[in-house]
Regions:
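N-terminal Rossmann NAD(P)H-binding glycine-rich loop of SDR-like oxidoreductase domains
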Residues: 3-23
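Conserved beta-strand positions in the Rossmann-like core of class I SAM-dependent methyltransferases
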Residues: 4, 28, 149
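Mid/C-terminal beta-alpha module of Rossmann-like enzyme folds, strongest
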Residues: 9, 173-229
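Non-catalytic, hydrophobic alpha-helical segments
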Residues: 12, 66, 137, 151, ...
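N-terminal Rossmann-fold cofactor-binding loop
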Residues: 30-35, 49-50
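Conserved Rossmann-fold cofactor-binding substructure of NAD(P)-dependent oxidoreductases
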Residues: 44-64
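NAD(P)-cofactor binding segment of oxidoreductase domains
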Residues: 73-100, 132, 136
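Conserved beta-loop-beta element that borders a ligand/cofactor-binding pocket
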Residues: 138-159
């Protein structure tokens, strides 16, 4: 399998690339900092920005699957996720590449009822612009003719991969903690099994929400509000 990865140097992106290389996949990754990518003989780094259609097009070239893990940082415009996704879709439309996986968040679309009250408040206030951009991203993907899958994870942590998670569409599950490594594992399993075509599954766990997790989520929110990584 030949993957094009966008958002490759983020927490989930690095873990996905590491697991993909271990599975003997070829990876092409768009990045502004090649030093942040995992190393390997089967990874090709394309330097550039997802807002540059030519760089996006070069990344998609000679691949058969695209994984979009875009997020927003203080150095980027507030609509980078949706604008970048539009460029990705257009690049795929120009090539025989139709399989697209996109990582968004629980709390969007039909999964809005799965998040706890304090997350709903944050999404409607401090994270409103970010979630609106993610919602626009989902809309663009769903309107495309691609074989897309939108994956909505629970609260992301840096815990190790366990392989113990639950997933599905309209399942009885709430947005509990899940490691980025497990999300990466689920993304690759979805590709291998060619599952959830034109669907938006959630992926989460049955873990209890502990003080440490709440603190991690709170500090992450604070960093976003203060404009730091």
């Amino acid at each position: 399998m030949k993957l094009a990865v966008f958002g490759a140097t983020g927490g989930t992106g690095r873990r996905l690339i590491t697991q993909a290389l271990a599975a003997d996949y070829d990876v092409r990754a768009l990045t502004r900092s090649q030093a942040k990518l995992p190393s390997g003989e089967q990874i090709t780094a394309i330097e550039g920005n997802v807002l540059d259609p030519e760089a996006v097009s070069e990344t998609v070239e000679n691949t058969d699957t695209v994984v979009c893990l875009l997020g927003r940082t203080p150095n980027n415009p507030p609509d980078i996720v949706s604008r970048g996704t539009r460029n990705i879709i257009e690049a795929m439309d120009d090539r025989p590449v139709s399989r697209l996986l996109v990582l968004t968040s629980m709390g969007l679309g039909s999964s809005s009822k799965t998040v706890p009250w304090y997350v709903r408040i944050a999404n409607a206030t401090a994270l409103h612009d970010l979630m609106a951009d993610k919602a626009r991203q989902e809309e663009l993907v769903m309107q495309s003719d691609l074989d897309w899958t939108i994956v909505r994870p629970g609260g992301l942590t840096d815990a190790p991969r366990t392989g113990e998670y639950i997933h599905g569409v309209d399942i009885d599950a709430s947005a509990r903690p899940i490691s980025r490594a497990d999300v990466a594992d689920f993304l690759l399993e979805t590709l291998r099994n060619d599952s959830y075509i034109r669907e938006a599954p959630v992926v989460t766990t049955r873990q209890s929400v502990e003080i440490g997790f709440l603190w991690e989520q709170t500090t992450t929110l604070a960093r976003r509000l203060l404009g730091s990584r």
